[in-house]
Amino acid sequence: GLKRKAHEAEVREQRTKALYEIARELAGALTLEQVSELARRFVGEQLGADALLVPADEYAHLQPAASLPAGNVDLLLLRMAADSGQTVRRDELSGDGDASLYLPLRASLRTRGILAVAFPAGTPAPADDGLALLEALASLIAIALERLHYVDVAQSSELKIVSERLRSSILSALSHDLRTPLTALVGLADSLFLVKPP
């Protein structure tokens, strides 16, 4: 009784600490690959499972998924999780190596992808606290992916502004270079028009 409760409290404390740590690491991630690697490492360390991050593009289409080293991803369940925005479980959560849990990465505006989790063959189904941990991780990943999206949007906007300034400068320089000779030619034409023929 008491030892079990003490052990459960210790596990909860370790997982809370791990969540704070992964949140900090995800906040510093600069690429999708870094986010994916952090997710895999966290799921492996905390639950002994394998994870695959399947991001969605800007049109909310899932990008082609690689396979999990431990097993396969069910594309139908992946699509169901993306379409419904809800966690989808295969009938049997106990490990057989194939992905059996699909968590949507819901951000403030839309779903940013799916986290597919595969439990190793022969492992029991995760307890409720393990599922809650995965849902918290999915929320953190969604926030990180949304932040990366907005960084890309800001960089793209900045690039457009710089290219527009460059285009404007080039056109201004060209127009000045063309204006000077044209002004001289117009002046000469006016002079010739004003001169009476002999």
Please identify what each model-predicted range represents.
Residues 1, 195-198:
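Short, intrinsically disordered, charge-balanced linker/junction segments flanking boundaries
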Residues 168, 172-176:
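Conserved phosphoacceptor histidine of two-component systems
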Residues 1-25, 144-150, 160-161, 166:
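Signal-transmission linkers at sensory-effector interfaces
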Residues 129-132, 165-169, 198:
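Long cytosolic heptad-repeat coiled-coil signaling/dimerization helices
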Residues 21-156, 183-193:
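GAF sensory domains
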